[in-house]
């Protein structure tokens, strides 16, 4: 079940040890989830045009972003999961930004159209290892997972795995784009990514989202709570943010950003019911 992966890192985008806290020199630092990048980057560009303030956005993973905000090396953390028990003790302010569904993706040549949550759990636990066991062709399942810093992994684990450990033979990748790319190029692969990244305008290859429990991962089913793998996306700050950072947050939550959030494949936080579990 091994898949060859080209290693790379986003850490150069934000040197955690080198950053100073605060919006000094007219710069706001935002770090965290790769899922949240489309929202954070579009808002950063528009906010910079309006205010002249520079907004540095980096996708290092939800856990890295939360750590950066808690130790003062970033002003805003973006996260595709809620705070865990230990993080809840850090004095962070939680700001829901959007609702999101986690899409289960396969290669376009894979004929499987639907998996139950139980089948997904057994696949990611290594109990189901061939697509023929779930109505597909006789082909080994190539598991693609996210790294432990990923908020998407934490949400998937919480909703799907029900205490079962992940199969250690899975390819473990550090970013949404990597997962999408590997699945698009590997006939037997399965992965999971934010619903908004399934049809990426930047990708050169395609993946296909399958139904889960016979429910399609679309905005309407996420908003209604019918799609089973749903979660919220968050910003976190360490206490009350500085005026410049608060202005950026207010812009992200404004009606002006709603259309951009929808175009990115998410549901603005002010629309629909809360999605899934943290």
Language-model regions: role of each:
Residues 1-17:
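Sec-dependent bacterial lipoprotein signal peptides
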């Amino acid at each position: 079940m091994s898949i060859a992966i080209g290693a790379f890192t986003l850490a150069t985008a934000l040197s955690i040890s080198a950053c100073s806290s605060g919006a000094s020199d007219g710069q706001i630092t935002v770090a965290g989830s790769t899922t949240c990048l489309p929202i954070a980057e579009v808002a950063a560009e528009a906010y910079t045009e309006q205010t002249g303030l520079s907004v540095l956005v980096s996708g290092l993973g939800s856990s890295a972003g939360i750590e950066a905000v808690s130790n003062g090396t970033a002003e805003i953390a973006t996260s595709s999961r809620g705070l865990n028990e230990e993080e809840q003790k850090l004095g962070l302010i939680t700001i829901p930004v959007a609702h999101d569904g986690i899409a289960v993706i396969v290669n376009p040549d894979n004929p499987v159209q639907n998996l139950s949550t139980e089948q997904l759990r057994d696949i990611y636990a290594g109990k189901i290892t061939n697509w023929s066991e779930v109505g597909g062709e006789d082909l080994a399942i190539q598991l693609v997972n996210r790294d432990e810093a990923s908020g998407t992994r934490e949400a998937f684990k919480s909703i799907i795995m029900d205490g079962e450990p992940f199969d250690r033979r899975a390819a473990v990748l550090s970013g949404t784009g990597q997962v999408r790319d590997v699945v698009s190029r590997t006939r037997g692969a399965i992965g999971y990514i934010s619903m908004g990244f399934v049809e990426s305008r930047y990708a050169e290859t395609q993946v296909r989202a399958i139904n889960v429990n016979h429910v399609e991962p679309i905005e309407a089913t996420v908003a209604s709570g019918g799609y089973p793998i749903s979660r919220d996306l968050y910003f976190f700050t360490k206490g009350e943010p500085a005026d410049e950072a608060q202005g950026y947050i207010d812009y992200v939550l404004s009606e002006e950003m709603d259309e951009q959030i929808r175009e990115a494949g998410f549901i603005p936080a002010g629309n629909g019911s809360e999605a899934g579990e943290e």
